């Protein structure tokens, strides 16, 4: 009985102990491959040791560097698979992962993120997040000290994964200070393998290493977390440095005589146990590596163990190196941090600690030191520059753009010389010149698009393209807006709209465009950047880039141009019923806008997503998109010029200038000399009222069959030919009127109303309440039959033509003619 009791008691204890333990599943997010013999290799090895010792499950994701979408998907997949302990070695995206962890702060999910100590949020609302700061400053100082001391060439190098001009260079400075502390006369060559955050490219790093070796460097340091740089040194007969914490001598023997060792297995085992046992400490301290453990510390700080093969060190230097290492091991008690106490920081930081040293935070936020023995090597020396545009595309765009500019200049000369031609005056020559000028600006912007990207061309081509389209579409919009206002005037009220009343509207649209462009340039950080071509690791090209604020400004700019296109579509729809061909540009405008919209919404928007999804940092999609934009701009502008000006040139070529005609034929009739032969015999100079009555009676006696034989019939030329009972009598202008920019003064018939020839380019509509004109009431089917009085021979002799359109009301014939 006692045995049974004790057995039950033991089982209860075991079950109780098991119930108090939490389940833990690890998900490891690696920046590169776990076979890199570097940081990723060591953390993956530590993961396997945790699995082995604690009997838990884990998953691993690799090659997440520079790819936030992949990081996001890896985190989601990890949580969906039940992982509650996520470990990240992606130092470049530590902020992104820290912010992402906030989405799960109310869940039992724990995080260990490799980053910097200043990345914890303030106020700190992430209790289950530990930030692992691998502080290798002293390790890099130690390796720089040895490299400079035993260098045979007096030159050592360093390859940084960060941008030398803009980014902090903490490890670079630590390596350099160690070098000058052992040999002040050393020459320090620095090069960056950073091409737009493409800083983990092993082939590029290998190539840069060979470049530094060719310049006499025999030791190369780097903050890259793999050994590709050291392999290049070894392949060229040099000595490798172990810079990642891996014990390279186990694999490469004497080829890596100097390194340091970091063991992460015990650290991960200890932290995982706190999750399983429920002893996780919220807002825990940051783990900082050092040469020795701090006395009395309770954290899990890995110890840096220096590894030195003294066979490669001359005896005269061995004691000096041993003394330096002993100082580093006792740095906590003696406060020996030589990388923080160099005189080079005197001109950088005014505020220091009482001992004359800067703080660790100040050192972490320091740029590359300025010293005479530091030489920066341009990383483009290893690469071949390749233009993003092929020569054939560049020559084609350049040739077509220059030819189109030449055509536009000829068109401007043509319009200026023949500005009094009827078809040109009806279309407002000044606005035609503005349209062509806008096209010239567009073609100039296209030429800049085909040139290599620089800071100036990146800014200038967008300015030219946007301003060109604003002048082109704005002038077209405002010019036809006036036509709509004048012809959509059923009550014939007087309206005077001159060019000078329209110019401010065009200028206002242009000002809005300039303001958006200024916002884009001021906030967008527009610049040219070098990017490695994805198809070749030894070629680069320049592309234009901007930040997120610049992208927002570009979206606003595109929306602004879209509104102009919609406005132009609306105006072209409203003027489609204008029955005078010289004023009706609805068809060419609609076609031009359709082509532009097709290019914008069909081609560009379809190409852009597929290009961006292929590679966010690759220059090929960017260059392809820019090429498409450039070709579309040239094509749409050239076609628009042909549509808007082709019919005008054809009319002048076939019909002549028409300087003595008040208005042209409507879209449904034409005046032909053959049609008017019967009227010419009986028509007079238009000033004799009786002769007009005779012509009227003669025309009235024509039978229906004769009317049908006429090849052309006159349709009432009104404002909009919607009603068959509305018509307007047009008085022909005098010669003085021909100096006006528009050849069609539309006036009421009321006696005493005349045309003011002093107001250039002015339309006038007068309300006439004394007369109401209708069609002939004798036959309901022939209300729109009008008689024409036109003497072709007299038009050639007189200075102005007399044109009358007569109507009949209440069976009374009334002929109105203008003397």
From Swiss-Prot:
GO terms assigned for molecular function: G protein-coupled receptor activity
Region (Disordered): 674-819
Keyword Transmembrane on entry: yes
Residues modified by glycosylation: 99, 185, 277, 295, 330, 370
Biased composition (Polar residues): 726-739
Membrane-spanning intervals of the chain: 395-415, 429-449, 458-478, 504-524, 551-571, 588-608, 625-645
Biased composition (Basic residues): 695-712
Alphabetically ordered keywords of this record: G-protein coupled receptor, Glycoprotein, Membrane, Receptor, Signal, Transducer, Transmembrane, Transmembrane helix
UniProt main location, coarse: membrane
Topological type in the membrane: Multi-pass membrane protein
InterPro entries: GPCR_3_C, mGluR/GABA-B-like, PnrA-like
Feature: compositional bias, Low complexity: 799-808
Residue numbers on the Extracellular membrane side: 20-394, 450-457, 525-550, 609-624
Gene Ontology terms: cellular component: plasma membrane
Biased composition regions of type Basic and acidic residues, renumbered to the chain: 748-768
Subcellular location: Membrane
Cytoplasmic side: 416-428, 479-503, 572-587, 646-819
GO biological process, one term: G protein-coupled receptor signaling pathway
Protein family membership: In the N-terminal section; belongs to the BMP lipoprotein family. In the C-terminal section; belongs to the G-protein coupled receptor 3 family. GABA-B receptor subfamily.
Entry protein name: Metabotropic glutamate receptor-like protein O
Gene: grlO
């Amino acid at each position: 009985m006692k045995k049974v009791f004790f057995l039950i008691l033991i089982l209860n204890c075991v079950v109780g102990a098991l119930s108090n333990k939490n389940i833990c599943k690890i998900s490891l997010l690696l920046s590169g491959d776990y076979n890199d013999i570097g940081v990723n290799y060591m953390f993956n090895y530590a993961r396997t040791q945790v699995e082995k010792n604690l009997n838990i499950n884990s998953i691993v994701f690799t090659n997440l560097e520079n790819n936030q979408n992949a990081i996001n998907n890896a985190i989601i997949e990890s949580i969906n698979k039940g992982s509650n302990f996520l470990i990240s070695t992606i130092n470049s995206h530590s902020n992104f992962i820290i912010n992402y962890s906030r989405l799960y702060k109310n869940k039992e999910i724990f995080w260990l993120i490799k980053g910097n100590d200043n990345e914890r949020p303030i106020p700190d609302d992430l209790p289950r997040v530990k930030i692992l700061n691998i502080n290798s400053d002293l390790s890099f100082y130690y390796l720089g000290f040895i490299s400079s001391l035993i260098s045979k060439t007096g030159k050592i190098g360093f390859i940084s994964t960060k941008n030398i001009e803009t980014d902090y260079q903490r490890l670079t400075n630590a390596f350099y200070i160690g070098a000058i502390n052992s040999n002040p006369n050393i020459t320090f060559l620095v090069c960056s393998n950073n091409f737009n955050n493409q800083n983990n490219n092993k082939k590029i790093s290998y190539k840069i290493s060979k470049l530094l070796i060719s310049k006499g460097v025999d030791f190369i340091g780097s903050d890259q977390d793999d050994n590709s740089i050291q392999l290049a040194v070894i392949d060229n007969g040099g000595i490798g440095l172990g810079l990642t914490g891996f014990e390279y001598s186990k694999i490469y023997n004497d080829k890596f005589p100097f390194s340091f060792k970091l063991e992460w297995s015990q650290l991960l085992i200890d932290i995982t146990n706190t999750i399983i046992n429920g002893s996780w400490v919220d807002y825990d301290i940051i783990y900082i590596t050092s040469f020795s453990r701090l006395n009395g510390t309770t954290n899990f700080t890995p110890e840096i163990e220096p590894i030195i093969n003294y066979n490669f060190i001359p005896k005269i230097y061995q004691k000096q190196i041993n003394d330096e290492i002993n100082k580093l091991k006792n740095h906590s008690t003696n406060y020996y941090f030589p990388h923080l106490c160099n005189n080079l920081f005197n001109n950088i930081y005014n505020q220091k600690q009482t001992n004359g040293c800067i703080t660790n935070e100040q050192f972490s936020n320091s740029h590359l030191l300025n010293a005479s023995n530091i030489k920066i090597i341009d990383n483009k020396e290893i690469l071949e520059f390749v233009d993003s545009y092929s020569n054939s595309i560049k020559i084609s765009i350049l040739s077509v753009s220059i030819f189109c500019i030449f055509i536009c200049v000829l068109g401007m000369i043509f319009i200026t010389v023949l500005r009094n031609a009827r078809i040109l005056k009806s279309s407002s020559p000044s606005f035609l010149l503005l349209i062509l000028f806008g096209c010239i600006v567009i073609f100039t912007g296209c030429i800049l698009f085909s040139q290599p990207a620089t800071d100036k061309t990146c800014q200038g081509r967008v300015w030219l393209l946007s301003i060109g389209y604003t002048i082109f579409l704005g002038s077209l919009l405002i010019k036809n807006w006036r036509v709509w206002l004048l012809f959509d005037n059923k009550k014939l009220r007087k309206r005077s709209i001159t060019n000078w009343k329209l110019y401010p509207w065009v200028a206002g649209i242009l000002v809005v465009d300039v303001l958006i462009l200024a916002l884009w340039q001021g906030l967008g950080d527009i610049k040219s950047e070098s990017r490695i071509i994805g198809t070749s690791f030894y070629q680069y090209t320049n592309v234009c880039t901007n930040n997120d604020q610049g992208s927002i400004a570009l979206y606003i700019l595109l929306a602004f141009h879209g509104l102009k296109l919609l406005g132009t579509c609306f105006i072209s729809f409203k003027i489609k019923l204008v029955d005078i061909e010289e004023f009706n540009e609805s068809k060419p405008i609609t076609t031009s806008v359709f082509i532009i919209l097709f290019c914008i919404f069909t081609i560009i928007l379809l190409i852009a997503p597929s290009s961006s999804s292929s590679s966010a940092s690759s220059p090929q999609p960017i260059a392809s998109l820019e090429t498409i934009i450039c070709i579309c701009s040239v094509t749409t502008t050239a076609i628009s010029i042909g549509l808007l000006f082709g019919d005008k040139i054809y009319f002048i070529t076939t019909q002549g200038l028409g300087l003595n005609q008040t208005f042209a034929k409507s879209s449904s009739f034409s005046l032909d000399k053959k049609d008017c032969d019967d009227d010419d015999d009986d028509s007079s100079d238009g000033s004799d009222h009786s002769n007009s009555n005779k012509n009227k009676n003669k025309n009235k006696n024509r039978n229906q069959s004769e009317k049908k034989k006429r090849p052309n019939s006159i349709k009432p030329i009104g404002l909009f030919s919607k009603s068959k009972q509305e018509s307007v009598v047009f008085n022909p202008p005098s010669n003085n009127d021909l100096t006006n920019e528009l050849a069609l003064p539309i006036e009421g018939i009321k006696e005493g109303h005349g045309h003011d020839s002093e107001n250039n380019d002015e339309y006038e509509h007068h309300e006439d309440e004394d007369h109401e004109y209708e069609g002939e009431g004798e036959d309901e089917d022939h209300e729109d039959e009008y008689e024409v009085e036109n003497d072709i021979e007299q038009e050639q002799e007189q200075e102005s033509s007399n044109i009358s359109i007569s109507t009949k009301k209440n069976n009374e014939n009334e002929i109105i003619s203008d003397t």
